[in-house]
Amino acid sequence: MHQRILILDYGSQVTQLIARRVREAGVYSEIHPGDVDDAFIREQAAQGLKGVILSGSHASAYEEGSMRVPAAVFELGLPVLGICYGMQAMALQLGGKVSFSDHREFGYAEIVAQGGTKLLSGLADFQNDAGQDVLKVWMSHGDKVTELPPGFSLMASTPSCPIAAMADESRGYYAVQFHPEVTHTVQGKALFSRFVREICGCEGDWNMPDYISEAVARIREQVGNDEVILGLSGGVDSSVAAALIHRAIGDQLTCVFVDHGLLRLNEGLQVMQTFSENMGVKIIHVDATEQFMGKLAGVADPEAKRKIIGREFVEVFQTEAGKLQGAKWLAQGTIYPDVIESAGAKTGKAAAIKSHHNVGGLPETLNLQLLEPLRELFKDEVRELGVALGLPPQMVYRHPFPGPGLGVRILGEVKHEYAELLRRADAIFIEELRNTKDPASDLSWYDLTSQAFAVFLPVKSVGVMGDGRTYEYVVALRAVQTFDFMTADWAPLPHPLLAKVSSRIINEVRGINRVVYDVSSKPPATIEWE
């Protein structure tokens, strides 16, 4: 059993980043709601728990009815790290005082370290004129600790937040008002590594080779000799799930690959070559293009299109699953963020939560047990696992693609003609992004963007080609850069790259005579157009 760190979530939108930072230090971590009972905490302690981290929150710690830290957290003798709200809750429960700050801090701040604590000693971005260590951090708080609890000492301060960090090293309690989990805090990774490795004493036994061995053993034990069916979309999550399950049980796995006619150029062929021909996975390839296109005819509303595509996929999958009489398990590519978001939606703890199609996705009428081998992993870990399992890096590290496919990248009604034009234009855009390197970083512009794609606009514009007038369609190019997809900036692609993409699309894709580039950030725009 792995050593583990328990993260108690009080509603912060970046709690998942805490878990990722801990895992980057080679230590397994799990997120659970902040109001779990004492029995749960003690149960965790009996399963290799080495420390606890208390997350931030959008709520105020001193308001009546605010969430409190389970008492057992402070009774087990384990190291505890409080972050923002977690610091304030710790202070209140251990005898300190918290008040609303006259000067709310949001954004970059510079904190001055006080004394040599285990957590912050030597973690400096620079030294000030007085020779004190200074860290560049990210603040986001309205409340602040105004009086230290008994036994605590000051660890760091800012002019507007005199108690920016505190510690009771005799008990292993540490708390910071800033957010070390976000990339803006320069020493954030080092801080988490020091807490989990040096203070909690974790050895760093969380790694991908061991995970593969353990996951294969779990799948074999769970499934036995039963048959498993999996809906293979060609996306990263379902592809990695298929590769992992196939390694565990071989021909007991059957994948159903539904081609709805809205995939990227040659995507169906690539999926079949990778899994069926190269890996020997049993795949049922269903070309349901006409069925989907027929149902989408005349439908322009984006949400209606999504629902139709989702409904038809379930119908096709159910039909194929019904033909496999021996199947007893339904495998899905559910990953850890899906599980966290689903739990948050049920408890209502998070401020902004989306539902996910994988969690409880397909109807219970299939009467199949659920197999989710990736449910402990974050996306970056899923990609690492995919490479370790032998999947092509281009498949594993490809940009996100919406479940409804090109159906939501064709504005308005979906038609065969529109899908074919968009497929070819999009392929040219992606090809040129892969082939063009940024001299400063030596990375391709595909790697420097988080998501890039073409959008089909169902309007025509006047153009001139040769000596003749044209009246043809328009495509928009969209490329964004983001850390978390909650906010995003449009990517500053080089003008020569955009010029080449535009020229190729207009010359090679008959039916398109104008290319535009989307320079909208999120917010106010969303990444996808529909």
Curated annotation (Swiss-Prot):
Active site as annotated: C84, H179, E181
Pathway membership, UniProt: Purine metabolism; GMP biosynthesis; GMP from XMP (L-Gln route): step 1/1
Function, in words: Catalyzes the synthesis of GMP from XMP.
MF terms (GO), sorted A to Z: ATP binding; GMP synthase activity
Entry's transmembrane regions: none
Entries under PANTHER family matching the protein: GMP SYNTHASE [GLUTAMINE-HYDROLYZING] (PTHR11922:SF2), GMP SYNTHASE-RELATED (PTHR11922)
Native source species: Bordetella avium (strain 197N)
Single GO cellular component term: cytosol
Gene: guaA
Protein name stated in the entry: GMP synthase [glutamine-hydrolyzing]
NCBIfam families listed in its UniProt record: guaA_Cterm, guaA_Nterm, PRK00074.1
